[in-house]
UniProtKB/Swiss-Prot annotation:
One of its GO terms (cellular component) is cytosol. Belongs to the RbfA family. This is Ribosome-binding factor A. Its main location: cytoplasm. PROSITE patterns: RBFA. GO terms for molecular function: ribosomal small subunit binding. It comes from the Bacteria. The keyword Cytoplasm applies. Keywords: Cytoplasm, Ribosome biogenesis. The gene is rbfA. Gene3D superfamilies: 3.30.300.20. One of several proteins that assist in the late maturation steps of the functional core of the 30S ribosomal subunit. Associates with free 30S ribosomal subunits (but not with 30S subunits that are part of 70S ribosomes or polysomes). Required for efficient processing of 16S rRNA. May interact with the 5'-terminal helix region of 16S rRNA.
Length: 137
């Protein structure tokens, strides 16, 4: 009897998850950028949508967002959560899927993490270590 091997998946999921996530990301970003959600908080912020991660069954989409400038993240998350039913319906109309995915909104903290690493790399102690490493090679 042959053994079934699971395919190794990339950190973001299968090709299908990545493809559907990108389609959902585009739909949400377009909706937010064109003022499709009539909410004063959301209309007052430019919101980027750098990534959407889909569950393996494609029924759950984790939407990573970041208000431009990184301000008012809690307020923006609350406004997105309050408008989730409308956003989900609007995305379902734009995306041809068997099920409209449930949306979870999260703040994308990669920018903050990258900035923290940049600051760390510029500290005198790290600069000294990097200089010593380059002198040895």
């Amino acid at each position: 009897m042959p053994k079934h091997h699971q395919k190794a998946q990339s950190p973001g999921g299968s090709q299908r998850q990545l493809r559907v996530g990108e389609i959902v990301r585009h739909a949400v970003a377009e909706l937010l950028s064109q003022g499709g959600v009539h909410d004063p908080v959301l209309e007052g912020h430019l919101i980027t949508v750098p990534e959407v991660r889909m569950s393996p069954d494609l029924k759950l989409a984790t939407v990573y967002v970041m208000p431009l400038g990184g301000r008012d993240t809690d307020v923006v998350l609350k406004a997105l959560a309050a408008n989730k039913p409308f956003i989900r319906t609007a995305v379902a109309r734009r995306v041809n899927l068997k099920f409209a995915p449930d949306l979870r909104f999260r703040i994308d903290e990669r920018f903050d993490e990258a900035e923290r690493i940049e600051k760390l790399l510029r500290t005198p102690g790290v600069q000294k270590d990097l200089q010593q490493d380059s002198d040895e090679t």
